[in-house]
UniProtKB/Swiss-Prot annotation:
Its EC number is 3.1.3.16. It is found in: Nucleus; Cytoplasm; Cell membrane. The keyword Metal-binding applies. GO terms for cellular component: cytoplasm; nucleus; plasma membrane. Probably forms a complex composed of chaperones HSP90 and HSP70, co-chaperones STIP1/HOP, CDC37, PPP5C, PTGES3/p23, TSC1 and client protein TSC2. Probably forms a complex composed of chaperones HSP90 and HSP70, co-chaperones CDC37, PPP5C, TSC1 and client protein TSC2, CDK4, AKT, RAF1 and NR3C1; this complex does not contain co-chaperones STIP1/HOP and PTGES3/p23. Part of a complex with HSP90/HSP90AA1 and steroid receptors. Interacts (via TPR repeats) with HSP90AA1 (via TPR repeat-binding motif) or HSPA1A/HSPA1B; the interaction is direct and activates the phosphatase activity. This is Serine/threonine-protein phosphatase 5. Residues 38-42 are annotated as: Required for autoinhibition.
Length: 42
């Protein structure tokens, strides 16, 4: 499990959120880098 805190509003009231991890997709590292370079994004 993991969690994060979101501070909202002018009083910075904390909201606590918990979630469970999901498996990463089976994608090679830097698989999208070539497409992004062609678009001039990076």
């Amino acid at each position: 499990k993991a969690s994060y805190i979101h501070l909202r509003g002018s009083d910075l009231r904390p909201q606590f959120h918990q979630f469970t991890a999901v498996p990463h997709p089976n994608v090679k590292p830097m698989a999208y880098a070539n497409a992004l370079l062609q678009l001039g994004v990076m």
